[in-house]
UniProtKB/Swiss-Prot annotation:
Enzymatic class: transferase
Pathway: Purine metabolism; AMP biosynthesis via salvage pathway; AMP from ADP: step 1/1
Subunit structure comment from the entry: Monomer.
GO biological process: AMP salvage
Domain commentary: Consists of three domains, a large central CORE domain and two small peripheral domains, NMPbind and LID, which undergo movements during catalysis. The LID domain closes over the site of phosphoryl transfer upon ATP binding. Assembling and dissambling the active center during each catalytic cycle provides an effective means to prevent ATP hydrolysis.
Subcellular location: Cytoplasm
EC number annotated for this UniProt entry: 2.7.4.3
Protein name, entry field: Adenylate kinase
Gene: adk
GO cellular component: cytoplasm
Species of origin: Stenotrophomonas maltophilia (strain K279a)
Keywords: ATP-binding, Cytoplasm, Kinase, Nucleotide biosynthesis, Nucleotide-binding, Transferase
Annotated region described as NMP, given as residue ranges: 30-59
Length: 187
């Protein structure tokens, strides 16, 4: 199973990816984790990413795609993978699909976790309070959600147009949401 989980901040992507990894016995791939691993390993891509990040800039699509290609050659990916929160724009989606076609591992499904904005703000605010993060004001959260909607809505449409998108209600108990995702990807 080769799966992408999309959803706004606070939608439960990371939580569900962790659960699905165990259930489906496949690798969980997070771009943030990939960046940290490549930097820690001192690879050429890691060095490039560190230089960009140290300058306060976003890592380019090319660097992320290079890291993804490297990650997809690891043995734990042979049975499949869950990509959590990537791709974030249509250019990344096109490049990733090209890479997956090249290595003979096209996506089986893309799942969009749908959660109402007010609930997302509530979830993130609650999480921020538990973790003691003062920077997660409702205004800042709304701004992050707007950026997500501006950049990722076209990715959702991109995969919907290819017939690989499943929209799943991301509200409810964790077991219920997991069951909805499993039903959607096995349908």
């Amino acid at each position: 199973m080769r799966l992408v989980l999309l959803g706004p901040p606070g939608s439960g992507k990371g939580t569900q990816a962790t659960r699905l990894k165990e259930k489906l016995e496949i690798a969980h791939i997070s771009t943030g984790d990939m960046l940290r691993a490549e930097i820690a390993a001192g690879t050429e891509l890691g060095k490039q990413a560190k230089t960009v990040m140290d300058a306060g800039n976003l890592v380019s699509d090319d660097i992320l795609l290079g890291m993804l290609e490297s990650r997809l050659t690891q043995p734990d990916v042979a049975k499949g993978f869950i990509l959590d929160g990537y791709p974030r724009n249509v250019a990344q989606a096109n490049a990733m699909d090209g890479l997956l076609a090249k290595i003979g591992q096209p996506l089986d499904a893309v799942v969009q976790l749908d959660v109402a904005t007010e609930l997302l703000v509530e979830r993130i605010a609650g999480r921020a309070k538990e973790q003691g993060r003062a920077d997660d004001t409702p205004e800042a959260v709304r701004q992050r959600l707007q950026v997500y909607n501006d950049q990722t809505a076209p990715v959702v449409d991109f995969y919907a147009g290819r017939g690989t998108l499943a929209r799943v209600d991301g509200v409810g108990e964790l077991d219920e949401i997991e069951a909805r995702i499993l039903a959607a990807i096995k349908a």
